[in-house]
Amino acid sequence: GKGRPFLYFAYGAAVTEVVIDTLTGENRILRTDIVHDTGSSLNPALDIGQIEGAYVQGAGWLTTEELVWTDKGYLATHAPSTYKIPACSDRPRIFNVALWNQPNAEDTVGKSKAVGEPPFMLGISAFYALSDAVAACGNGSRYVALDAPATAERVLAAVQRQRDV
């Protein structure tokens, strides 16, 4: 293979702070700081909204959106009553988004870059912040497995395993 599979890359970084209840596994995102590469932003307010929404969706994917299957292979979590997607209240209490506003070197509209899907992956920072919080329940030097999605039940189980180490 030769060729160029992508016209350009959009980069981003996120740092997330969480808190966990070690008796129940309940958790909350307290703060997130994001910088995202938008190229020359065509509409900064719109781009920030897209970045925030994609982050919350990505964090939900890794913390609450659990697929449960029955013994017969049917999806049990197929409705809003059984499949927990993020709500407005699940966004970080402190949410800072900065745009890395450098013109795209490629010939794109207004030298801009995509902001709809790439920031989705920044939600991974919420999952790893939970993993760090679980590790802090021990001596902080050992990480036990935390399965995704990191539901309250899975966080609690990881805390218990961490304390047993």
Language-model segments: what does each one mean?
Residues 1-165:
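Cofactor-binding beta-sheet edge motifs in enzyme active sites
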